[in-house]
Amino acid sequence: MSKKLTFQEIILTLQQFWNDQGCMLMQAYDNEKGAGTMSPYTFLRAIGPEPWNAAYVEPSRRPADGRYGENPNRLYQHHQFQVVMKPSPSNIQELYLQSLELLGINPLEHDIRFVEDNWENPSTGSAGLGWEVWLDGMEITQFTYFQQVGGLPTQPVTAEVTYGLERLASYIQEVDSVYDIEWADGVKYGEIFTHPEYEHSKYSFEVSDQDLLLGNFERFEAEAKRCLDEHLVHPAYDYVLKCSHTFNLLDARGAVSVTERAGYIARIRNLARVVAKTFVAERKRLGYPLLDAETREKLLAEEGE
């Protein structure tokens, strides 16, 4: 019987595969976020006419999902392997199935289903056609063809593939609890993450200072607007991410009512939309540097008319 891949070997295998498909290997973005989609390597790069192919691991924090390290499948922080390709390759689903084969999952020997599940992220004004990928009855991946990001239509169409690494590793290693996953030879997932999960859960549900967080949200929102006034897209987006994480902490703590919740989401969405519009305008001002010369000249001429 062949040796099962460790968590980090799964990551290395996916990195090598998508590198071979022409993706740049980016690093995790250094701000808290609820999903890999919220990284600027996806959110910003999915809009505008320039091509973009990237793959990266993204630790994703969801305070309300924390379970003090006691639930085998619910986590404060999990890891996603994010692939984003623009324009979308026509064979991206076939490429995805090839990646599973490299992980030791033969599509001919397993029940692999693409279950329609259109995707929406209200806090960033983003949506797309999507499918959950189910492997023998367990969701392991989300496929999305973005239709809009930051309230802007995506042209060309961007494809996103988001692997849930903990679920994938649980399946490959045949364990019932994420804490039993072998991260590296001789080191279990739980030996690294159980106590941080407990501490972050305790903070999110019991200890966080609600007044501090409420004040932080206001300050982060104001700073994002100030950055946008100066056309500083990336600093502004950093503060949008901070607003989002602060809201998630408030939500986990039960500090916002249903009505207030909708208001906070709208405020984050409005900021994200301005960031998106400003980013596209800045890329145009720079002359769309990632486009080839012929396409760039043609597009700039058309937009200048």
Swiss-Prot record:
GO biological process: glycyl-tRNA aminoacylation
UniProt keyword Lipid metabolism, yes or no: no
Family: Belongs to the class-II aminoacyl-tRNA synthetase family.
Residues making up the signal peptide according to the UniProt record: none
Gene name as annotated: glyQ
Keywords: Aminoacyl-tRNA synthetase, ATP-binding, Cytoplasm, Ligase, Nucleotide-binding, Protein biosynthesis
SUPFAM superfamilies: Class II aaRS and biotin synthetases (SSF55681)
Annotated Gene Ontology cellular component terms: cytosol
InterPro entries: aa-tRNA-synth_II/BPL/LPL, Gly-tRNA-synth_heterodimer, Gly-tRNA_ligase_asu
EC number(s) reported in the record: 6.1.1.14
Catalytically driven reaction(s): tRNA(Gly) + glycine + ATP = glycyl-tRNA(Gly) + AMP + diphosphate
Gene Ontology molecular functions: ATP binding; catalytic activity, acting on a protein; glycine-tRNA ligase activity; transferase activity
Subcellular localization: Cytoplasm
Lineage: Bacteria, Bacillati, Bacillota, Bacilli, Lactobacillales
Primary location recorded for the protein, binned into one broad class: cytoplasm
Pfam families attached to this UniProt entry: tRNA-synt_2e
Name of this protein: Glycine--tRNA ligase alpha subunit
Source organism (scientific name): Streptococcus gordonii (strain Challis / ATCC 35105 / BCRC 15272 / CH1 / DL1 / V288)
Domain of life: Bacteria
Complex and partners: Tetramer of two alpha and two beta subunits.
